A protein has these predicted regions:
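Extracellular beta-propeller repeat domains
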Residues: 1-163, 168-173
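Short, composition-biased motifs enriched in small/polar/acidic residues
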Residues: 154-234
Length: 234
């Protein structure tokens, strides 16, 4: 407390609850604290945990050391979508570590497995940029095996593109505009019948540099055409 009162909220046993919490904890929007242990847990590869301000600890995930990763030495972040994101130093498809997403209820998704070429053994926390991407570093890997700085696009963090009203131009084309996030890449697609699932790409992917992106399309002999925009991931 501010007057110097020290209280131990929880002591790890090094068993199913985990052990060696190298990183700190974060307080999420729900008021609880979340963190990782670098070792132990039910499967011996570290854990993600939740702890209340009263010291009640819940293990949200015990890493198995397979595709879910192992030995998370870094802390977590809570991104703007409300989910928690973190890294494991090892495990994953190539045993070079992972980036993972986990809900506050403990549902874990591996977003990427490092393979050495794109980096290896991340041991620091991620940062969510103002562009809604996640940024981080790896200790090893990359062309010279001295580590990399990486950016990871998580589609759920990027707002869904929203079209403005189209404008019919006098030369037989239609002007299209939609909301974008600068730095993200979008692909315009179309179909002539909404019953079809075969959406066709129109032109090359477009790298947005502002909050609104505009382009045009030739209507041609089509009596109707439907458009959509999808976010292109790396």
């Amino acid at each position: 407390t501010t007057n110097g009162t020290f209280t131990t909220l929880y002591s790890f046993y090094g068993s199913s609850d985990g052990g060696f919490p190298y990183a700190g904890v974060i307080q999420a929007a729900d008021g609880n604290f979340y963190g990782t242990t670098g070792d132990d847990g039910q499967l011996g590869n570290g854990t993600v945990f939740k702890i209340t301000t009263n010291g009640i600890l819940t293990t949200l995930h015990s890493f198995a050391g397979g595709s879910d990763g192992s030995f998370p030495s870094a802390g977590l972040i809570q991104a703007s979508d409300g989910n928690l994101y973190g890294t494991t130093a090892y495990g994953g498809t190539y045993n070079d570590g992972t980036v993972f997403q986990i809900t506050t209820n403990g549902a874990l998704t591996t977003l990427i497995s490092f393979n050495g070429t794109n980096g290896a053994n991340p041991q620091a926390a991620l940062v969510e940029g103002t562009d809604d991407n996640l940024y981080g570093t790896t200790q090893n890997g990359g062309p010279m095996d001295y580590g990399v700085i990486f950016r990871l696009t998580v589609p759920s963090l990027v707002p869904t593109p929203a079209f403005s009203a189209p404008t019919l131009l006098p030369n037989g084309t239609i002007a299209l505009a939609w909301s974008t996030v600068a730095g993200q890449t979008y692909q315009l697609q179309s179909v002539t019948n909404l019953a079809s699932t075969n959406w066709v790409n129109l032109g090359s992917p477009i790298l947005a540099n502002s909050a609104v992106t505009t382009t045009s399309d030739v209507i041609g002999s089509n009596s109707q055409r439907f458009y959509r925009v999808v976010l292109s991931t790396p």
